[in-house]
């Protein structure tokens, strides 16, 4: 099976959840020949991210994080490129046609990549992208749940 077929299988719109076996197969294929497969994978990633089907994009975002964390520094460099971050991820946050839940997931992925790539200063573009998300699109960053307010028990509550 070719790399493209594996990526299409891992991001199939019929999948309702991530299939980690398919995702790991893609990561293994990319790692088998990074010089040839990373540029090909990034080309396909860009095409899949531009799809209108939210299911495809959601599966691809998970695959993108997995590839960034498992396919080595060359893949990280490609993901951290300004062109990819700006054109494929940040542009979707400003697009009114993109569903709100998808925007939450894109912001979450940028945050996750920022945490994963923090140790490498050459990947600073991801930190810059995350800073831009925090500044321009804070509504898409999930805040921790607020603590419920404490209320004093009434006499009636104590009787029950």
Name what the model sees in each region.
Residues 1-160:
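Eukaryote-specific intrinsically disordered, low-complexity regulatory regions enriched
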């Amino acid at each position: 099976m070719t790399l493209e077929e594996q990526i299409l299988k891992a991001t199939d719109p019929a999948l309702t959840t991530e299939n980690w076996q398919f995702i790991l197969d893609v990561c293994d294929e990319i790692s088998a020949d990074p010089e040839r497969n990373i540029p090909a994978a990034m080309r396909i990633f860009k095409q899949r991210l531009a799809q209108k089907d939210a299911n495809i994009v959601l599966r691809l975002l998970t695959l993108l994080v997995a590839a960034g964390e498992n396919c080595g520094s060359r893949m990280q460099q490609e993901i951290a490129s300004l062109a990819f971050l700006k054109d494929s991820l940040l542009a979707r946050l400003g697009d009114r046609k993109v569903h709100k839940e998808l925007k939450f997931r894109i912001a979450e992925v940028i945050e996750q990549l920022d945490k994963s790539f923090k140790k490498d200063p050459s990947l600073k573009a991801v930190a810059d992208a995350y800073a831009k998300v925090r500044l321009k699109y804070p509504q898409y960053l999930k805040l921790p749940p607020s603590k419920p307010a404490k209320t004093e028990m009434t006499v009636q509550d104590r009787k029950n």
